[in-house]
């Protein structure tokens, strides 16, 4: 019993978001995916507007992304785990292709989670977006376009390639995957939301640095 207790304490002490370990604070993919981010480190957030945890981490993640400057190429992919999510995925892809996603991203989250609006309904999403400044005709034209359908198929391929089964999940450089859930398990106990999100950002810092160093060494 004493040995077991000491072992647990040692494992807990080894957990550190600033020095993350594969298999604990993050996962290393067996099959890394090619990225198209040029000299920058690609960071992808897989998320869903339906997801309360995605809503909760969004402010911390936005702040982290803004602090990275030109070091990273950041993008979001709205997941599709079942057909009921299709309209929200299509809405995000539409807004992204219109270059309007960032302007209304937080507002959609608030509409869904703070004000409990049924934005999973296409008509209600369209009405909501019109009220927050999106041109309805341009939105609907893009929403129905072949380009959006093509992007959605590409997103589905990414979802399968990265074996994403829950959200939020954040992929760095096509090879490292982390999330608040990784940190919750690693830190043990019951970390508060702010602690959990701060630790996740620290892991992202370390993974971006790791990826950048590997890229520099490969030149």
What do these predicted regions represent?
Residues 1-86, 204-219:
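Extracytoplasmic thiol/disulfide redox context detector
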Residues 6, 101-106, 138-142:
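Long, low-complexity, intrinsically disordered polar/charged segments
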Residues 49-53, 80-84, 110-115, 145-148, ...:
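Solvent-exposed loop/turn segments at secondary-structure junctions
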Residues 69-97, 102-130:
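Structural microenvironment flanking redox-active thiols in thiol-disulfide oxidoreductases
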């Amino acid at each position: 019993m004493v040995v077991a207790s000491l072992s647990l304490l040692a494992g807990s002490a080894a957990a550190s978001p600033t020095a993350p370990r594969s298999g604990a604070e993050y996962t290393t993919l067996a099959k890394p995916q090619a990225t198209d981010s040029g000299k920058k480190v690609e960071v992808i957030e897989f998320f869903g507007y339906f997801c309360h945890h995605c809503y909760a981490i969004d402010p911390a993640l936005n702040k982290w992304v803004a602090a990275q400057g030109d070091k990273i190429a950041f993008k979001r992919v709205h997941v599709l785990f079942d057909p009921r999510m299709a309209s929200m995925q299509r809405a995000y892809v539409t807004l992204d292709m219109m270059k309007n996603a960032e302007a209304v991203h937080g507002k959609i989250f608030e509409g869904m989670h703070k004000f409990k609006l049924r934005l999973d309904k296409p008509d209600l999403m369209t009405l909501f977006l019109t009220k927050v400044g999106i041109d309805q005709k341009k939105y609907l034209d893009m929403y129905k376009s072949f380009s959006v359908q093509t992007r959605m198929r590409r997103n589905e391929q990414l979802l399968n390639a990265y074996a994403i089964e829950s959200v939020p999940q954040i992929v760095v450089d096509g090879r490292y995957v982390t999330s608040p859930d990784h940190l919750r398990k690693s830190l043990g106990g019951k970390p508060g939301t702010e602690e959990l999100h701060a630790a996740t950002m620290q892991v992202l810092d370390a993974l971006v640095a790791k990826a950048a160093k590997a890229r520099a060494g490969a030149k």
